[in-house]
Amino acid sequence: MAAARPTSVRDLLHDAPRSLRVLSEEHADGWGIALRRNDTWAVKRSTTCAARCESYAGLDQEAVLAIAHIRKKTVGDLSLANTHPFQRGRFVFAHNGTVDTAPLVAATAPEHTASLVGTTDSEKLFMFVLTHVDRVGEVTAGVTAAVRALHALGSIGSASFLFSDGDRLYAHRDNRR
């Protein structure tokens, strides 16, 4: 979610017919949300199903940017380190799908692979995107370069993601298998 002024995330999280709470019954391996307020990210995550988590039930906050995620694990064990969204400084990232990580890691800067905390394909995809942002030196052009590089890799899986630098929200939908 991106808004010009602080906006409630309640509908997205709780009230909509396909809210993350409802969808978490199928995607029950944890949840996370990054809320941008006062030029700072507040990131909350849990390995508990959102529909059964007390701290999730209490979420009704406002933000100008929000990235929320419910996890159905495919790669990486159930742990906070593997729960989205991931944050590195001002950058926040969440991914949906499963990707082959070998080509991603091969094209990722060593300093980013060294900073991996968890074991998911998603965090490796995040480091791939950050590598391109660093190489290009500008966020929008870097995200664009990362998407082009993903397409050049061919069929590596589903690489749909949300990415933010704290000012803008980028969304990429890619369901190639």
Annotate the PLM regions.
Residues S46-A57, A68-G89, A107-E111:
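Short acidic (Asp/Glu) patches
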Residues T83-V99, R148-R177:
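Conserved catalytic micro-motifs used in adenylation/nucleotidyl-transfer and phosphoryl/amide-
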Residues I33, G97, L125:
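Residue-level signal for inorganic ion chemistry
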Residues D100-D165:
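Short histidine
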Residues A2-A4, R36-A68, L125, V129:
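Short, compositionally biased leader-like segments
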